[in-house]
Amino acid sequence: MLFYKHLYATDTEGHTDMKGRYWKIAAVCAVVALSTAALWQGLQTTHYTLVSPHLEKPVRFAVVTDLHSTWYGENQSELVGAIEREHPDAVLLSGDIVDDKEPRDAAKAFLETIAQKYPTYYVLGNHEFRTPDPEEVKDWTRNLGVTVLDGTGETVTLNDQTVLICGTDDPACGIADFQNQFFAVSRMAQQTDAFTVLLSHRPELTDWYTDAGFDLVVSGHAHGGQVRLPLVMSNGLIAPGQGLFPKYTTGLHELEDTTLLVSRGLCRNWLPRVCNRPELVILDATL
């Protein structure tokens, strides 16, 4: 009987130890899996729809922002391929495509390739203005076939729909220049019945965008708030120009008669993005 009890006790203790080891292994695996998912940097395509009375035909825009000279495959094949699969009518670039500290090769490869395929519109962000010569960035970008907007706009036909696409330099160009550019494009928007789009890098300038006459404002800059925790920090932890717990980091936001679209952007060169995959945004503007 004593021998049986000893065997039983040994077996029970061994079984308990084995269960404990299993739980520890499972916990480690869960932590690794969750960490991998949270830090995954794979490109995501996000779709939004905007309904506007100023449209008679639908128009599809691909929005690319905050690339920061990041590579997405050889010759940017991953990013370009993702855009091609969506068949946009135009590509909108809302700043920081070129980075002031990274080589320009990645930005040039993307701009040159995409401009050969789609009408492409570009405004400079704060990082382009940190380069030695922002005007030189505009010049070589235009030479690649990209339309650079700096207090200017173009009325174009996309899918048989008239659209006015305007843009301003980032306020880093100088506040007086930014004001002059913004007032110029706002006057253009208020004098047309067409669907109006403004490319402007910073989403936090909502006081400027409200009642400026644009149906849609497209921005980036916030990098999705960098660290996002579902249900806890859905807008992210921090964003330039907004500080901690920012409001405008992703998605569509109604600003009275204007809709603000914020992309989380594509940079993955710097600080890790947590629960915050880089994104290509596809916006369907429809009647």
PLM region spans:
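Conserved beta-sheet core of the metallophosphoesterase superfamily
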Residues: 203-281
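Binuclear metal-dependent hydrolase catalytic cores centered on His/Asp/Glu-rich metal-binding motifs
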Residues: 139, 143-146, 158-199, 206-207, ...
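Catalytic metal-binding/acid-base residues of hydrolase active sites
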Residues: 68, 98, 127-128, 153-154, ...
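N-terminal membrane-anchoring alpha-helices
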Residues: 1-55
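Membrane-embedded segments
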Residues: 57-152
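Beta-strand-turn-beta hairpins that frame and shape the catalytic cleft
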Residues: 51-62, 146, 154-166, 193, ...
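Extended recognition/assembly regions associated with phosphoester-bond processing machinery
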Residues: 46-52, 187-199, 203, 250-251, ...
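Structural motif
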Residues: 59, 90, 163, 195-197, ...
